[in-house]
Amino acid sequence: MQDANAAFAQYPSLKDRTVIVTGGATGIGESIVTHFARQGSRVAFLDIQDGPAEELIIALASKGCPRPLYFHCDLTDLATLQAIFKQALDALGSIDVLVNNAANDQRHSVEEVTPAFFDTSIATNLRPQFFAIQAVIPAMRSAGRGSIINMSSISWMIPSIGVPLYVAAKAAIVGLTRTLAHELGPHNIRVNAVLPGAIVTERQRRLWYTPEYKAEIMASQALKRDILPDDVARLVLFLAADDSSAITNQSYIIDGGWV
């Protein structure tokens, strides 16, 4: 179990840094937004879940954190995504950190995938990451720095059945991360990937985290405890902070020792 009284890192370099998080209203994204706000960062986040987004903003404001900006955005609509990123960049005035977190792991078999479902899955789990990066590059290049953190998954590294398109997209994100790290490195823009394992979010608890699935996870992990959204968020903070200024082109697994 985690120590409830543990003290975690505060990163001075993240104070007043500007951050955009996709899929920031719930789950891992909510924890990422919360952790950046606690660091004193200026955060904007995108999501399609207005209710949870507003609840998060109110909760953070009540704790004295900088009030994050929320933008309703369907990431599968590319024109809307590009327009919202322009609005977010205009509102923040600059961009130091991009966290490409949004995804959808809807279960699907090979047989039931239609061309339309294929396109929607890629338009949710891969295409937005590329075009979000494209949107922030000019501002990061002008600033002479930036940290881009792409959320992949260990799903492509283990026997994952029932989510072939999700797995394919998550594998592609690692390739995208590696090539862009080299392309953007000369501009002091770092690009890294985070590969979570079985993270116990509220959605996972509601849909799939049965006693049988938990037993499978615990049999696979070296650490015999739930891996939580906060665990992922703390890794993201490190990769965003100046403490990791020499780190790029890396893929960090956070799965309790499953892989």
Residue ranges and their predicted role:
Residues 2-11, 158, 237, 248-259:
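Short C-terminal tail/terminal secondary-structure segment
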Residues 99, 185, 190, 247-249:
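Short, small/polar-rich loop/turn modules that mediate ligand/substrate recognition or access, typified
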Residues 109-110, 114-122, 217:
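Substrate-binding pocket helix/loop in short-chain dehydrogenase/reductase
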Residues 130, 145, 226-254:
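C-terminal substrate-recognition "lid" of short-chain dehydrogenase/reductases
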Residues 133, 169, 177:
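Active-site helix of classical SDR
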Residues 138, 182-186, 245:
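Alpha-helical segment proximal to the catalytic Tyr-Lys
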Residues 153:
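Residue(s) in the substrate-gating loop at a strand-loop-helix junction
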